[in-house]
Amino acid sequence: MSITNGTSRSVSAMGHPAVERYTPGHIVCVGTHKVEVVNYLAEGGFAQIYVVKFLEYLNEFDNTASVPLKIGDVACLKRVLVQDENGLNEMRNEVEVMKKLKGAPNIVQYFDSNASRRRDGVQGFEVLLLMELCPNKSLLDYMNQRLSTKLTEAEIVKIMYDVALSISQMHYLPVSLIHRDIKIENVLVDAKNNFKLADFGSTSTCFPIVTTHQDIALLTQNIYVHTTPQYRSPEMIDLYRCLPINEKSDIWALGVFLYKLLFFTTPFEMTGQFAILHSKYEFPVNKYSSKLINLIIIMLAENPNLRPNIYQVLYHLCEILNVEVPIEDKYAEGAYNFSKYTQFQNKLQNVQLQMYQLQQKKIMQNNKLSDSEENLLNDMFLSSFEISSKLPMNASDGHAAVSRIPSQNVGQELEEEKESQSDQRKSTLSEDKSSRTTSNANSSGTANNPQEINTIQSPGIEDKSIFENKTPGELYYPSVSELDTYLDKELVKQSSDPTISEQSPRLNTQSLPQRQKSTSSYSSGGRSMKSTSYGAATIGSDEALANEKTAGINKMKQHKSNNPFPKMNVAYHSTNELSNDASNFFLEEQQQGQRYQQAQNQTGTQGNTFPDESQYQSRVEQQQQQQDQPKGPANYSQRNFYTGRDRSNKPMQLGGTIAGDSGNRRVNFQNISQNYATNSQSGYLPSQNSPAIPMVRPVISMNQQQAQQIQAQQLQAQQMQAKQQMQAKQQMQVQQQLQVQQQMQIQNANNNGTYVSDRTNHTTEDMRNAQGGEPPILAGNSANEPMHSSSKNEALLIELSPLKEDAGKQSFQDTNEPQTGGIEDAGGSGTIKGSNNNRNGVLNLSLNEMDLSRDDTGAAVSSFSSSSSSASIQQAKLSGRKGSSKRNNYSTDELGDSMVSSESIDIDLDDARRGKTAERRPLHNERGHKDQARSSDASKSNQFKSKDFSSVSTRQPRQSLDLNFQEVNLSSPTLTQEHRNKNDSPAPNSHHSYRVSPHASTAITENKRHSTGHELSTRSNGKHETHRTGSKQRHDLERYRHSKDKDSNSSITISTSTPSEMRKSFARARQSLDLERVRREAMASSASSSGGSNGKRRSFFSVFRSEK
């Protein structure tokens, strides 16, 4: 074909490639007709319309038209480009329909057609259709010319008559055809101003009742493609009504057509498909005759059985025109009986009014009605059963249909029916067809007969159907049991990411809305129905009713979809997906919390045994990771922890108040490490605004890994302490001390030989005990553990709180707080004393002088238990020292008697070697005065002697301790308080050597006080407190200088020596920058002090006091 203008236009709005137009004068052969293009007329989505002039027949013998074209006649050429065989078949269908309607009145006439493959190298076909030309364009153009004046009633009747007559030609065929796309745009106006029906591309035969989901899906897609939304009938929109799509659908479209002729808009323009389903519309104020209005009313009846047939429509129009009906009554029903419709409508409206009144009464009476009124209400639902019965599934088709296409649940159906009820109540003033009463009648049965609903089962649904026919994008919602199994596995992993099962743990598959898909931008059928979720009880509400239309039918009706075009919404997903990230996240947290509680309850019943070392190691690693970052000690903001039950954002309290404070028990802190790890992963970081302990990053602290491990050990130690007996506690303390000594021996190879082995044995035993959940609980710990005031409280908390993995961290947290009164007020001082007495047997001299006995012993036990759970013995030793210091805080009366103080001193020396000694030794500033009196009681120290300590004494751990303690001038229990004051003052002063904020220093002093070795306390504090000194020497200097200069930093009263002694100690501190020198002096003094005159031991600090 020659192209002269060179212009090209897009063939369709769907993005098809541009196609060149025919130019005027172009010759085209259509079948046996040769035509010449006169001009381009219009273009549609797939077609181009030309005005052509008939030239000649290519074959006279092929001319079979009843009214043949004459040469020179003008015709219309429709050029359609189709992409595939499907498009070609549709065009073939249109041609066939037009051939059948050739010669019929008010139908656009067909002349000829031709189909061929495209010649421009593009895949597809070109279809040419030659037909009658209507020069006055379409009815839409005709109406657009009358926008201001509107159409007169005569014009409307004329148009309706012509269109109804054309439709009758289709309905009266031997096999009735339905146009399915009757609308203003498809009516053309010929040269004589007659109105003719065109565009038969959507025409089809009547559709049988479809009952299977697959058939419904296919028909839904077909309807969507070939019909116009505003003209669709209710049975087209809701195929689950199982109503036939036949000539009555054309009658509905014709009623919308008439409404638009009157009011230039469709009745459902502003309301949508649900208004169509219930035929809810209104008439604007108008001056049209009631005959036209009534005709609209009966044609727009929701019940297709109440709509007139085409003969009755024509009869009514002819009655208005006062002409004879041009067709005979094929249906033999005569004229439409308006009285019948009025009677039906009045009855329906009366029932609706009564139902409305009963519903209002029910609401006023708190949803209660008498039995008679309830039965009446149900009967009214039945009596308002307006639409033809919803046919259940065929027995043969139902099983297969259900197995491959699920239905929605009854709950959704009931909600729909309630909506229809409200629509019915509101429809008493409308003249349109009765509202959808089938669902109303059914709702009465389903709502009031739940047993029937439960007994009716879907014939084809099996459990496996839930998993079948799931498309890749389909979501699966497991059952609760599956979720439990999944959570049990995930609990070990402690994954912080909510899974799908966790997002919707309580959802049944039947409660999920039907998922909708689309195979194309305009398709709504196909296999999408297979992807919908299965309902456990897919029951048609009609089956629950004893309605005569459904009685005796054992098949099941799947509930209809609210969305008549389920395949359109590609991105449509379950409504549950939006709320999963938030609510299910907390479901997950709650479930995990419950499992933690269960695990704790189990541990509590089993004697509060601790997890295996491997598990504990993993937890310690988590704690270490947490502790690598600066953070508040352990009293994090409670809102950061989900699993805790008794958490409060209160600052750490003194031991005296904490002892009985169950509200501040360590419920939350036991699980801090894990919680913090998971919270940090999920974006929740613990608050660093710890109320009592300022967070400081240690500049010069022990190895962070060790410190972290020590903290973790402390946390666990306290936890284990809550469950053990005093004897076991004492043993644990002794073992911790041994561990401390062993560490010092490892560091100081000179003295460590036998002592290390002894300590190693004890540490292993302690670790076993700790794993067995036997580490003793010292009442003194209550002072340090505001969250665990007593073992009783701990037992309760175990049930309520998550697993107690952070006992070490608890003690650490507690020690950070100032506890001036806590030492004396600690509830468990008596028990601590007993333990301390045992230690005094071994370390009477050192402990009495240092006043660390009780605190150190308690901390030693706790830290030892924590260390026992950890893999490293050194960590255990360090933790033992720290833990002992904690316990010493609880009862300062017995400080002088415990080995812990000596051990703590050893630890301090080790730390000094590391640059930490000066920092970690802060001995009890508070103890200074209190401990003097307490230490003065040698009898107390003797009381503290125990079996365990006696065994320790045989080992003579003194040698390792002597290095550190002899300089402290630790004396026998009979030492004068003056010596004690001296010893105590430097220790707390050294404790203050940390240049930390007043609160931090206070916490540090207490921590050091609590920890015998002071290392543990300093380490734990070191995590949270910054040592501002820049070097080891600097630490030593600052320790001793600030121990005296900055005693005010500590909330604990410090017993200081005379000013001259303080000056001398400062001088010594300056001279002690060389730690090696100090160590050598300590070693030298250890030998002399062990057998020194007066039977006194010389402590590390004695180096600074020697020159008085």
Curated annotation (Swiss-Prot):
It comes from the Eukaryota. Residues 493-513, 781-791, 810-819, 935-976 have a biased composition (Polar residues). Residues 436-449, 514-534, 590-629, 859-872, 1049-1060 have a biased composition (Low complexity). ATP binds at residues 41-49, 70. PANTHER family: SERINE/THREONINE PROTEIN KINASE, SERINE_THREONINE-PROTEIN KINASE AKL1. Phosphorylates SCD5. Present with 3000 molecules/cell in log phase SD medium. This is Serine/threonine-protein kinase AKL1. It comes from Saccharomyces cerevisiae (strain ATCC 204508 / S288c). The gene is AKL1.
